[in-house]
Amino acid sequence: MSEMLEYPALRSLLLEHSRPVETETVSLDESRGRVLAEDRKARFPIPDFPKSPYDGYAFRAADTAGASREHPVTLAIVEEIPAGSFPTKSVTAGTAAKILTGAPIPEGADAVIPFEKTEFTEGTVTLFAPMRAGDNLIRIGEDVDADTVLAR
């Protein structure tokens, strides 16, 4: 019958007879069936800018205080921001930017409302309810924070 080893002796024996595993860097395509040598972490937050979850309008929530069907708020549209583009103008008091899904939120805006909850013309958008700062925004790092372990 084999002799039972205590943990310290077993650990010493294993360390004495083991050797470090070699590592190599390979492309993702070559990684199938392999084991990571170390955790892989996000190098930056995803998304790395605040963006819109809807096609709609980005504006200052403070401009909608008191908005209702009886007392709507109309804002001037200062620019249109398609997905894949970056804003060139800031949103200021009384203004909004037309924004498409995934587009970055312009400077000064702190809320987004979907098209279907507004009435709009070529140059204005009308809102019928108050909004709060942060409503309908995808925040920096909302999907993945920087340094989050992505793979083990």
Please place each PLM-identified region on the residue numbering.
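Short, low-complexity N-terminal leaders and the immediately following helix N-cap/first helix
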Residues: 1-69, 75
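Short, glycine/charged-enriched hinge/interface segments at domain edges or termini
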Residues: 2, 58-152
